[in-house]
Amino acid sequence: MQFTEFWPFILYAGMVLVLVALIVGFSYILGQRPRERATDEPFESGVVTVGFARLRFPAKFYLVAVLFVIFDMEAAFIFAWAVAFRETGWIGYGGALAFITILGVALIYEWRVGALDWQPKGRKHKKHR
């Protein structure tokens, strides 16, 4: 291999480095320097903020987010199976059925242990008569 094969890549890498240096340099030159008390407050379109801006999300939020990702991946796998349904035959059908069954059992388990329950633990559902 000769140098002439690599010069476009070297030129591209050099241009990227120059562009990054320019962006960082302009940011440093034009950026805000003095740290005031208002710098740490969230921007609310000129409206004075009320309350504490750094709220903690309950762990339930993250659990539901993880469950969403898991079951969203299930949908992607089922879609891929549906596209290749004719090529996979009965073996593919059995595999997809086992996959859906396992994830269905996992969903029922998560529901039973309360992973999808957003109510505080002290409250019970009131039945309307």
From Swiss-Prot:
Q: Describe its partners and assembly state.
A: NDH-1 is composed of 14 different subunits. Subunits NuoA, H, J, K, L, M, N constitute the membrane sector of the complex.
> Which protein family is it in?
Belongs to the complex I subunit 3 family.
User: Where is this protein localized, as stated in its record?
Assistant: Cell inner membrane
Q: Which residues cross the membrane?
A: 6-26, 63-83, 89-109
Could you tell me the EC number(s) of this protein?
A: 7.1.1.-
Say which domain of life the source belongs to: Bacteria
Q: Does tRNA-binding appear among the keywords?
A: no
Catalyses which reaction(s): a quinone + NADH + 5 H(+)(in) = a quinol + NAD(+) + 4 H(+)(out)
Q: How does this chain sit within the bilayer? A: Multi-pass membrane protein
**Entry annotated with the keyword Glycoprotein:** no
Name this protein carries in UniProt = NADH-quinone oxidoreductase subunit A
Could you tell me the keywords of this UniProt record? Cell inner membrane, Cell membrane, Membrane, NAD, Quinone, Translocase, Transmembrane, Transmembrane helix, Transport, Ubiquinone
Short name of one Pfam family: Oxidored_q4
Q: Species name for this entry?
A: Nitrosococcus oceani (strain ATCC 19707 / BCRC 17464 / JCM 30415 / NCIMB 11848 / C-107)
Query: Would you tell me the Gene Ontology cellular component terms?
Result: NADH dehydrogenase complex; plasma membrane
Recorded GO molecular functions are: NADH dehydrogenase (ubiquinone) activity; NADH:ubiquinone reductase (non-electrogenic) activity; quinone binding
Q: Which gene encodes it?
A: nuoA
Please explain the role this protein plays, according to its UniProt record. Answer: NDH-1 shuttles electrons from NADH, via FMN and iron-sulfur (Fe-S) centers, to quinones in the respiratory chain. The immediate electron acceptor for the enzyme in this species is believed to be ubiquinone. Couples the redox reaction to proton translocation (for every two electrons transferred, four hydrogen ions are translocated across the cytoplasmic membrane), and thus conserves the redox energy in a proton gradient.
